[in-house]
A protein has these predicted regions:
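Short flexible loop/turn segments at helix-to-beta-strand junctions
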Residues: 10, 75, 105-118, 149
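Membrane-proximal HAMP signal-relay module
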Residues: 1-47, 51, 56-72, 81, ...
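Bergerat-fold ATP-binding/catalytic subdomain of histidine kinases
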Residues: 103, 200-211
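Conserved catalytic submotifs in the C-terminal HATPase_c
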Residues: 112, 132, 137-149
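A residue-level detector for a conserved hydrophobic packing site
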Residues: 155-159
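Short beta-strand/loop element within the Bergerat-fold HATPase_c
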Residues: 173-184
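Short helix-loop "hinge" at the ATP-lid/N-box region of the Bergerat-fold HATPase_c
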Residues: 165-167
Length: 250
């Protein structure tokens, strides 16, 4: 049983009254959990949506203050920049929460055939300079053609968040290898510290080690996209490398 997984009720044709009552109690508890889960999703979606405007207003006003820097001391400008960095983090966090809410509420009905070889190539090229800034080497291995029918924006989010995760949590000066084959997409990054908790790695806000610039939601977005389209996620720590793999139906 998985909350939000649209689980079908288990058949129970027992004639034993105690078992029947136990089954009825379990069904009631499951239904109550589903209602609470739906309310939580709705609250997060509504809250994230309502926060967009005030966050944008705060951001614009801070930019106006910085733009008129002549009226501020160097110390004041420094404090404003700190607030701006915190606000930028909140904006990214809010966008991620809103995206998660939309995915879970099925707000991406449009689908098309997504060419992951081309998508990974474009994304890797776009991020190559960012990787270079940390001295990281990004390599792409194509072992086959990979295509799947899904919303193109969500396909892009899937790839982007896997590559961002490798960048944020990978070793400076380390390597990131992206492998595309006929039925899987994997991203491996070198990283010390040992294996992460495979049972919780895709949960919201789980972080093996807090890293600046990370919202803790990237892998949750990956997992949400995969669950939406029936894909399987897998994590493994192999030869001092963290490997995240998405398995596609053959």
């Amino acid at each position: 049983y998985r909350v939000g997984g649209k689980n079908a009720p288990l058949a129970n044709d027992t004639k034993i009254a105690e078992f029947r009552r136990l089954n009825e109690a379990a069904i009631r508890n499951a239904e109550r959990a589903e209602v609470l889960f739906d309310r939580q999703k709705q609250f997060i979606g509504n809250a994230s949506h309502e926060m967009q405007t005030p966050l944008a207003v705060c951001r614009n006003r801070l930019e106006m203050l910085v733009g008129d820097g002549s009226a501020l001391s160097e110390e004041q400008l420094g404090e404003i920049m700190k607030v701006q960095r915190t606000l930028d983090y909140l904006v990214r966090l809010n966008r991620s929460l809103l995206l998660l809410s939309k995915i879970e509420n099925g707000q991406f009905p449009e689908t098309e055939q997504v060419d992951f070889n081309a998508l990974v190539g474009r994304t890797a090229e776009d991020m190559s300079e960012i990787y270079a800034g940390r001295g990281m080497r990004l390599s792409l291995r194509e072992e086959g053609r990979l295509a799947a029918r899904m919303n193109s924006s969500l396909g892009a989010s899937l790839v982007t968040n896997l590559l961002k995760n490798a960048y944020v949590h990978g070793d400076a000066g380390g390597e990131v290898t992206v492998t595309v084959s006929g039925d899987r997409l994997s991203v491996c990054n070198s990283g010390a510290g040992g294996a992460l908790d495979a049972d919780h790695i895709f949960e919201r806000f789980y972080q093996g080690a807090k890293k600046e610039g990370s919202t803790g939601l990237g892998l949750s977005i990956v997992d949400a996209v995969c669950r939406l389209y029936g894909l399987r996620t897998e994590y493994a720590y192999i030869n001092r490398c963290h490997c995240f793999t998405v398995h596609f139906p053959k």
